[in-house]
Swiss-Prot record:
Belongs to the orthopoxvirus OPG155 protein family. It is found in: Virion membrane. Envelope protein required for virus entry into host cell and for cell-cell fusion (syncytium formation). The gene is OPG155. It comes from Variola virus (isolate Human/India/Ind3/1967). Its main location: virion. This is Envelope protein OPG155.
Length: 146
């Protein structure tokens, strides 16, 4: 064996030893790792200290690029009529004849979530808080859920 092959054997042995040491370290601290992950799981997709939002890129939805809480879309119970999708922009709307807009209502929370966070690109929005209807019941409800 020449000196070059001995050098490579020593480097390979050191690399394998480092892998074993790392594996043993994880094995010894596995309980602490699980406790840390359980404690901080609620912050998994929250905004980081550095100012860059940590996004879940596995599933794309309408809230991925929004950091203001009031702008995020959410499904809320509508008084007496199921559920609606709301944000500071207004409610998701149904467009009727003569381009009239009304609040899109859903029978179940699951239907609301499926529609709100689906891949629908063209979403009609109805904001009851624009003039002249600033003090109507729908506007008061929108302000109360934000």
């Amino acid at each position: 064996m020449n000196s070059l092959s001995i050098f490579f054997i020593v480097v390979a042995t050191a690399a394998v030893c480092l892998l074993f040491i790392q594996g043993y370290s994880i094995y010894e601290n596995y309980g602490n790792i699980k406790e840390f992950n359980a404690t901080h799981a609620a912050f998994e997709y929250s905004k980081s200290i550095g100012g860059t939002p940590a996004l879940d890129r596995r599933v794309q939805d309408v809230n991925d690029t929004i950091s203001d809480v009031k702008q995020k879309w959410r499904c809320v119970a509508y008084p007496g009529n199921g559920f609606v999708s709301a944000s500071i922009f207004g409610f998701q709307a149904e467009v009727g004849p003569n381009n009239t807009r009304s609040i899109r209502k859903f029978n179940t929370m699951a239907q609301c979530i499926d529609f709100t966070f689906s891949d629908v690109i063209n979403i009609d929005i109805y904001n009851p808080c624009v003039a002249p209807n600033i003090n109507n019941v729908e506007c008061q409800f929108l302000k109360s859920v934000l």
